[in-house]
Amino acid sequence: MSYRVLEAADAHWRPSNQMGVLNTDLARQLEAAKLGARLWRLRPGQASTRHRHSETEELYVVLEGTGRLRVDEDVLTLAPHSAALVEPGSVRQVFNDTETEALWLVVGAPVEAANTLEMSAETLRELYPDGPRALPPELGGGEYEPE
């Protein structure tokens, strides 16, 4: 077969391990071997993990709402259908400090599933320099606490 289809109604959404952000791993559900792609739906006040990748680029595309993305010390504000490419080594975090939901498509190379609950302390420090639950200053800083 030369293609696969995942209907929106069939996509499996789940909250992320650390920050509770709803996401669906499109690439995994479509059995992609050379591509990583997820949709992330951030409610007002939510943020993804502040993290880095040592070898892979990531493309961030805002599909709905206003996209807010911190890359190292810069904060980007992106309109729907705008995109940002983040290079390897840069620390990045999407967050939502607006009053409406934001939907992101994040595309990159396939990465092994990163289970932050089972990582060594050294790996956690390398990938998540502020810890896997760090909130951006725009959301008050500190750590995310599950409800």
Q: Which positions does each model-derived feature cover?
A:
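A short, N-terminal "cap"/entry segment at the start of jelly-roll beta-barrel domains
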Residues: M1-K34, M119-E147
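Glycine- and acidic-residue-biased ligand/ion/polar-headgroup-sensing regions
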Residues: E55-E57, V61-G67
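Ligand-binding loop in jelly-roll beta-barrel domains
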Residues: E31, R68, P88-N115
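Conserved short histidine dyad/triad with adjacent acidic residue
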Residues: N23-D25, R38-H53
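Conserved hydrophobic/aromatic positions in well-ordered beta-strands
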Residues: R38-W40, Y60, F95, L105
